[in-house]
C-alpha cells in the first residue's frame, strides 16, 4: 500500500520543493507543496508539474490526490 511518506518522497525526488506535506489513507491523499518552480504558473500547470514528478504512480497507485500548490511567497 502506498503511504503518504512514499508520495512525499516521490514528489521531492522529481520536483525542487521548499516544503511538502502529505496526508492520506493509502488511496486518497492531500498534499501541500511549496516550490519556487510554481512562480508564474497557473494552478493547472502547477498540478501538471506535480503529476510529472509522480509519473505512473498517479495512475497505478493513487486513487485521488488533492493538492495545494504554493510559491514560497504565497505560503508566507
Language-model regions, residue ranges each:
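N-terminal first-folded block
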Residues: 1-27
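Solvent-exposed beta-strand sheet faces enriched in polar/charged residues
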Residues: 23, 32-34, 68-70
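A generic structural micro-feature
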Residues: 23-25, 43, 59
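A short acidic, often aromatic-flanked loop/helix-cap motif at beta-alpha or helix-coil junctions
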Residues: 28-30, 75-76
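A short interface-forming secondary-structure element
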Residues: 33-45
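C-terminal structural segments of small proteins and small subunits
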Residues: 47-76
